[in-house]
Amino acid sequence: RLDDYQHLRRLGTSVFAVSYRGYAKSEGSPSEAGIYRDGKVAFDYVAKVMGFLPSRIFIFGRSIGSTVATDLAQDKDIAGLILVSPLSSARDQASVMGLGFATPLVGTAFENDKKIKRLKAPLLVMHGTRDQIVPIRMGRKVFDAAISQKSFHEIEGAGHNNLSNRFAKSYWTTISVFLKQSSKNR
């Protein structure tokens, strides 16, 4: 991911990355409520301590990070939301993983497809056509549910973990254009 952060810097952005509790080298155990809190603390730090206006902040979430990004972005006056390979809900993800029997157990967890309806900011959804971890239909479901200004970028042949490197030109050009267009409207 460091390469991705460096690329975002080359596009002229400041980057504040979060490692959620229980992920990577972060301590603690992951939970839906916990990672949402981590996202909120990070956003509040960037806005209140670092002094960035929320209307100039883009929130970026990839895969499971899309759930934190979507939860955080709802009802906020931010510059934009970028979701890469977003899952639509834990229920849908359990079904994709062959855990259909578990769908009643996940309840309303990670419901991007519901929360995205409260997004006011511009939205960019990017997804690979060959994503076998979070199928593209989930990204489309999130996109279709959004009512804000939105665009969907499908990357032909891309899987779940190779969008930013193997398909770099399409990926980074799309992000660059979105950042410029959304910033212009602020």
Regions found by a protein language model. Give the residues of each.
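Short alpha-helix in the alpha/beta-hydrolase fold that links the catalytic acid
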Residues: 4, 112, 121, 135-144
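Membrane-embedded segments
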Residues: 1-45, 73
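Mobile cap/lid helix-loop segments that gate and shape the active-site cleft of serine hydrolases
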Residues: 79, 83-121
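Alpha/beta-hydrolase active-site loop signature
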Residues: 20-24, 88, 159-160
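Acidic catalytic loop of the alpha/beta-hydrolase fold
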Residues: 129-134, 160-162
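C-terminal catalytic histidine-bearing segment of alpha/beta-hydrolase fold enzymes
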Residues: 140-144, 148-186
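Primarily recognizes the serine-hydrolase "nucleophile elbow" in alpha/beta-hydrolase
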Residues: 45-49, 54-97
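Short beta-strand/loop motif that positions the catalytic acidic residue
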Residues: 118-120, 125-127, 131
